[in-house]
Amino acid sequence: MSKFGLIGDPIATSLSPVLFNAGYSGELEYDLIEGNDFDASWKSFLDEYDGINVTAPFKEKAFRKAELFTPYCRKIGASNLIVKTPDGLLADNSDFTGIICSIAEAYFPGIVAEFCGTFGERAHIKVHQFFRQMSERIFPQKPQALIVGCGGAGRAAAVAAAELGFDTALMNRTAEKAQKIADELPEYNFIVDPVTDFRAALKECELVIYTLPMKLDAIDSLTTEDFAGENPSAGPAKVILEANYKTPSFSGAAMDRINAAGCRYVSGREWLLYQAVTGYLRLTGRQPDCGAMSEAIRRV
């Protein structure tokens, strides 16, 4: 029987096994390959598994071990999925497709389920194309995105936002890391904003993708007006997508202000769901049960 797993640290509370087992009715094996030693985890994969998911802090290291790459994975320079193929180790990045689907679903509720039913394994491609086609109709001018955090997930978020047609700014506690992404991907014309400009940058943009594992101090002082933006009556409401679903930075009073401003907050659980749906198909070659996965993530 085919065998799959997850490497990273820490992963003991990961929801990936729950989603995988729901997607395939427990018919395929999925393990947590726990440990903070990348080389040991990688050896376990090579010795025992057909494919693995990869989470922090191993995404860049796994990318460098691969021999084949999907186009967007190569651009992103980090992988959350490695699968053995007859031609070698293939790296993919379903964070990218998960972000595409999460953003599209926020603006067009129901689109992902509809397109999954219609297009199957090509659903995320069709979602991507649909959003690009509709962008000019829903935004009065070219929309802006702010990516906070420039690790593996942040890099995937930056490429996804730019591919969806957003003018995209990068922000990281270490500005050099953000600048490195901008320099390596000049085709996207990324700009780099300092963390000290977080409030102003958030206020100006239509989309925020927050990938830092911890909360910036400035979040607690954000007002309803900051979340609403400079011209809240023009175009759709601001969307805030956060990667961290375990201890989200936008919670409590910040969430109250997000709701009061009419913004749409997208939990990292939704990102996790959509990256799993698209990633598991690549991992196993079998279409997972999207409905069962969605129900499973709502129950936990």
Regions found by a protein language model. Give the residues of each.
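Phosphate/diphosphate ligand-binding glycine-rich loop within oxidoreductases
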Residues: 2-117, 122, 136
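Rossmann-fold NAD(P) dinucleotide-binding segment
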Residues: 61, 216-241
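NAD(P)-binding Rossmann-fold cofactor-contacting core
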Residues: 166-185
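Rossmann-fold NAD(P)-binding glycine/threonine-rich loop
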Residues: 241-282, 286
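Glycine-rich adenosine-cofactor-binding loop
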Residues: 8, 93-95, 103, 143-162, ...
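Rossmann-like NAD(P)-binding element
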Residues: 199-221
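Short glycine-/small-residue-rich Rossmann-like dinucleotide-binding loops
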Residues: 57, 211-214, 244-245
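Short acidic low-complexity segments
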Residues: 39-42, 187-205
